[in-house]
Amino acid sequence: PSDTVNSGAVFYLKASADPTQKWEAIALPHEPTVHRMQWVQIDAKRWDLVVQPLHGRANKNNAGVGAKMLAYEKPADPKLPWKITVVNEVGHVTHNLHATRWSASPAQEILSGSKEGIWLNSFKAGAWINTALTNVPTGELRDGKLANGQRFLATVEPFHGTTSAVYTQDAEGKWVRQQLLDGFKEGHAVACADFLGTGSDQYVVGWRGADPGIRLLTPLDAAGKTWRTSTLTTKEVAVEDFKAADLDGDGKPDLVVAGRQTKNLVILWNAR
């Protein structure tokens, strides 16, 4: 992360005719400090590879040009040049991104966090539009829905942060912050899902530093004004990342947790 000039790499892996044999690694252009990537739906038939670096090129002390989040459009032959479009280049210390869908369009929007706050990045008429939603430095972020149908944003703040907050919109559409947790170290994951089957999403937040853990935050009213905190794990897993998914087909989201420092992979099965 400290080398903002020459670090990082992006490869597309092409399967051989026999996928059990060695795959071909195709190098793609990249920004330094590349950190997160995922496929994002751009229209009904197209998915782009979106890559987020930590810092802008040649940044020092988290200052300088903005970090370039790039969208790579795959050609029919992946060995040919990929069309690359800048998604967002105004944020600094940009740790994570989240593809979501806020409209009826097939296209997904991208939520991204930065030192400047949370951005909503939308692809419209062939170009990316960046809308600032908040102004608090943000590292991790996901979105969920409350029982009243209102959307909320769940965060770790700031980069590798020590606090977690939720944002809901007021009558004027402004995102209002409510801090729910603080005092942890190196927050590194957030996920939203209806783990409890209440008709409203809850969110989980995890961290890896000092006394690691995962907490479940549950809204106690339809508008998300009051939340309850429950402990899911403690020092047994230092959370690097996690993903909510229904692994056993019972209709209930489970949680897959990866611990880098604790060198383990843990599945929290939903037993409700």
Spans of features found by a protein language model:
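Beta-propeller-forming repeat regions
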Residues: P1-R272
